[in-house]
Amino acid sequence: MSPKQVIDFFGSQVATARALGIEQPSVSAWLKTGEVPMDRQYQIELATNGQLRADLPAMRVSQ
């Protein structure tokens, strides 16, 4: 998933940060690097009920 997809889903960088319990500068850093860290991707997948999916589904951990 791309940072833009995540931010578009939640509506803003601030809303994304709040939904994930992180600070907004962390979300801004994703835009600068062009990628969402894998551990956050899994958290986002869970937070969106799978509407956004982690890039490496084979590496998912069981819940």
Outline where the language-model segments fall.
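Charged low-complexity stretches with an acidic bias
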Residues: 61-63
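Alpha-helical and His/Cys-centered functional microenvironments
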Residues: 17, 28, 45
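DNA major-groove recognition helix of helix-turn-helix/homeodomain DNA-binding modules
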Residues: 36-55
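A short, Lys/Arg-rich alpha-helix, primarily the initiator
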Residues: 1-15, 19, 49-59
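Recognition helix of helix-turn-helix/homeodomain-like DNA-binding domains
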Residues: 22-35
